[in-house]
Amino acid sequence: MKKITLALSAVCLLFTLNHSANALVSSPSTLNPGTNVAKLAEQAPVHWVSVAQIENSLTGRPPMAVGFDIDDTVLFSSPGFWRGKKTYSPNSDDYLKNPAFWEKMNNGWDEFSIPKEVARQLIDMHVRRGDSIYFVTGRSQTKTETVTNTLADNFHIPAANMNPVIFAGDKPGQNTKIQWLQEKNIRIFYGDSDNDITAARDCGIRGIRILRAANSTYKPLPQAGAFGEEVIVNSEY
C-alpha cells in the first residue's frame, strides 16, 4: 500500500511539474514578448525616397529656388528650445510667445544646435546643381539674427546660393509660409511638419518630408507620409 501511495505521489508531482512547464512555454512574458517575421517585415505604406533619387529626378532641369524649414529639418535645435522652456516657462509652452526667448534663440543659441546629416546631403546636392537656397522658418522675427550665418557656415553654402533666413512667424489659423514660397518662386520645399507639407501643396509645388528625430522637444511627432508626400529615408538625423 505504501508503494502504491508513493507511486501515485510521484505521478502527481510529474503532472504538476509538466503542467507548470507547459504554462511557462505557452504564456509569453510581458518583459520579453518576442516577435515574428511578419511583424519584422511590416512597413507603413509610405512613399520613401533617397537623396540620390531626388537628385536623379532633377536631372536635366535648370537651377531653381528650393526651400528648407529649419528646426528639426536641417538643425536638431531642441537644446535651445529646451533651455528656453526651462528659463522662461518651465510649466508651459508660453516661452514660444516670449520675445526674450526668440532674441536668444535667433542670436547665438543655434551654436548648440546639431546640423542634420540629411540636410548636408541635400544642400550639397542643390549647391552642385546651382540652385538658390532659402530657409523659411516659423520662428518669430527679431531685430538681429545670426541664424543665416550659422546655417551658411554649418552647411558650407556659397554666398551665390545662400539667401537670408525668412522668419515667417506663427499666426493662429494661418500657414505663414505659403506667401514666402510663392513670393520667392520656390519649387521644392523640405520640412518635418504637416504645415511644411501643406504649405507646399497649397502652392502647387513639391513638398518633401524630412523625419523629425524621436527625441525632439517638439511633440507629438507628425505622421510622415500622411499626405502621400515623399519621405526621405534615414532622415531623422
UniProtKB/Swiss-Prot annotation:
Main location: periplasm
Coiled-coil annotated residue ranges, if any: none
Substrates-to-products reaction catalysed: a phosphate monoester + H2O = an alcohol + phosphate
One MF annotation (Gene Ontology) recorded for this entry: acid phosphatase activity
Enzyme Commission designation: 3.1.3.2
Subcellular location: Periplasm
Annotated positions binding Mg(2+): D69, D71, D192
Family named by the database record: Belongs to the class B bacterial acid phosphatase family.
Top-level taxon: Bacteria
Cofactor: Mg(2+)
Subunit relationships: Homotetramer.
Positions with a binding annotation for substrate: T137, G138, K177
Gene expressing this chain: aphA
Organism, scientific name: Salmonella arizonae (strain ATCC BAA-731 / CDC346-86 / RSK2980)
Protein name: Class B acid phosphatase
Leader sequence residues: 1-23
Stored InterPro entries: Acid_phosphat_B-like, HAD-like_sf, HAD-SF_ppase_IIIB_AphA, HAD_sf
GO cellular component, one term: outer membrane-bounded periplasmic space
Described function: Dephosphorylates several organic phosphate monoesters. Also has a phosphotransferase activity catalyzing the transfer of low-energy phosphate groups from organic phosphate monoesters to free hydroxyl groups of various organic compounds.
Pfam family, one: Acid_phosphat_B
Entry annotation: catalytic residues: D69, D71
Keyword Nucleotide-binding among record annotations: no
